[in-house]
Amino acid sequence: YEHPHAFYRGQIYQKIWDYDGSSVSNKQYFSQSGQDKIIHEVFFKDYTHGFFLELGAYDGITGSNCLFFEKSKNWDGIAIEASETQFVKLEKNRSCTTLKAVIGERVEEVEFVEVIQGLTQMSGINYENYSRSLAIFDDNEKNQIEKRTVITKTVDSILREGMVVDFMSIDIEGNE
């Protein structure tokens, strides 16, 4: 269920963040709409040396919900990205552990669609709800995609036994 005014509320929050984000004090934050600032101020204001798990880390900088914690609060973590193109950038941009993987509920073979040109943040697993994204790619010749079969990994298989995750960010463009 989505509230009928959610779209407009999101646009208003984005405009506020765009304006607020122009201030010098907000330059340290990296998320798309100030999520990292809110998470920091509400939950982790004085918390240093935490541990994050970032699913959908993209290039490690653009829209990152965890980079602030890594750079400013001495956190460590694991940044995971499925796109081969973006993973190369992620490895260069982050000092935390990076992992190229497609995360799933269970280990299985899936088709991964990588957008290598155009809407590159829209790469994802090709399943029934992804058909709308594929239609968008087909409608715009600027988008170039590559499909490949991959084996998913589970979050449990990535984390060591007893590992405590303080903050988990899942940013996979509506495919959560």
What function would you assign to each model-found segment?
Residues 1-176:
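Phosphate/nucleotide-binding beta-alpha loop and adjacent structural elements of enzyme active sites
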